[in-house]
Amino acid sequence: MLDDFFIRALLVGIGMALVTGPLGCSVVWRRLSFFGDTLAHSALLGVTLSYTTEINMALSVFVISSIVALILLKLQKTTNLPSDALLGLLAHSSLAIGLVVIGLLATIRFDLMGLLFGDILAVNVNDIILVWIGGAIILIVLKIIWKPLFASTVNFELAEAEGMKPEKYNAIFTILLAAIIAISIKMVGLLLITGMLILPAAMARNISDNPMQMVIFSVIGGLLSVLIGLFASLEINTPSGPSIITAGLLLFILSLSRIKKKTQLNN
């Protein structure tokens, strides 16, 4: 018989996998994995804002991550720095500022390891509600913008020429990334949330023949990562968040055999 805390963790993990699957595919297609890292690092500033102002942590993380995302999009247009330099600048600067602020708040106790790596086994009913309702909103918005977003991924200039306003949908997509980071911070932490986005999508890309297959397999990969990771953490007493990411890595490694078979068939 599973304990209540484990069932809650499963419900949260399943909800996350359903959302990170489609989002992760778009991240992989658009080569935005480091962009996700930047938003995740900036989330630490949102955490400190939550502690200092006593507002909801998910809300403060969402606000800060969204601001950083929009600043980054603006800087990409107005500076000559390459995107990877801007990403590194904002990622490490925001992380450093967040850690400095934590150091200055000597009267407030922080679970820094929990913030960085998460603790999905400590979630409560409110977290389940947040993940499922927040995730549903993210998926609805993603469904609405999916066609122009996908078109701009394939050919940005053509999408712009057809009046699809790709920059507008890029901004909306980055805000969706900020939203999934905000609702997932307690579960897998700041440093591992990008793994939930990238690993299932990367695995799915290896075994898929078209974009829709990739989305479906990415969701399945995320669900398997959650199930394998959580049960493994329960059996061998390992941290739950890192165990989920490790399970995703193992699935990715297994998917490489499909690439090898494709290569052999082509030869």
Feature names for model-found ranges:
Residues 193-242:
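Transmembrane alpha-helical segments in multi-pass inner-membrane proteins
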Residues 241-245, 249-267:
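Cytosolic-side transmembrane-helix boundaries in multi-pass membrane proteins
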Residues 12-20, 42, 46, 50, ...:
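Alpha-helical transmembrane segments in multi-pass membrane proteins
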Residues 25-108, 204-216, 233-235, 259-261:
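Short loop segments and helix-boundary regions at transmembrane helix junctions
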Residues 1-18, 267:
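Membrane-interfacial amphipathic/re-entrant helices at transmembrane-helix boundaries
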Residues 140-173:
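Membrane-helix/interface signature in polytopic inner-membrane proteins
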Residues 7-8, 77-79, 87-147:
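Transmembrane helix-bundle core of multi-pass membrane transporters
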